[in-house]
Amino acid sequence: MDEKLICLQLGALLHDIGKIIRRAGLDSKEHSKAGSNYLKNNNLLADRYKEIYDMIYYHHAKYLSSADLKEDSLAYIVYEADNIASGIDRVKYEDKQIRGNEMDSLNSIFNVIRIEKNNLKKTFKLFDFDKNGFNMPTSSSIKLNNSDYKKIINHIKDNLNTFKENINPEKLAIVLEACCSYFPSSSYVDTPDISYYDHVKLTAAISACFYLYDKENNIQNFKEEYFFTINRSKEKFLLVSGEFSGIQNFIYTI
């Protein structure tokens, strides 16, 4: 079991938790500070995975550039993974006062990908943890509020306290999928149709790929690799696809 890899994946999954804190009205600081402070103040993950605090606090360039971190800090990996998962260069946005409405609901992707006759704009309501339900987008105007996000952060905190030493990325991902799949990751984009969960899950996957590649190739200076001299032409990823057509007849006999 690679404890550093587990810590990295947990940190990547939680790197944007400050957005939920802000939207819940619990802290007005920038989300990187709000998230790190929340975990510290509630003594969450402090025993084994305290480095997660740095991954949350320093995942944007303006704080990371002046951070007193070791060259092998996992915060550098999360920083670059977050940039790639976002599909943008975060540096262009960090020093600008670009703010959307943090209470906007998640847009349906079919608001953009649609047939000619479909001009309805649909959004999702916040899912209420009903395991037997299915959350369909609606054309009704939906605005989320502080209490919606308070329920979410309390659900996450309760689970983190329950897991304690037995936490792992898979358990945390299940919790986040249940409560974070139906509100947007970013509030400053034109079309908020990427969910919070999808963004942090992708950030964690990219972080894990970086770490495993670097471990195999004996790369230990993450500060140089992911902050000072970023080289995105390195082939660190392998996308695997499979073809399962033709097995329907077998499936129907089960």
What is each PLM-predicted segment?
Residues 141-249:
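Low-complexity, highly charged intrinsically disordered N-terminal segments
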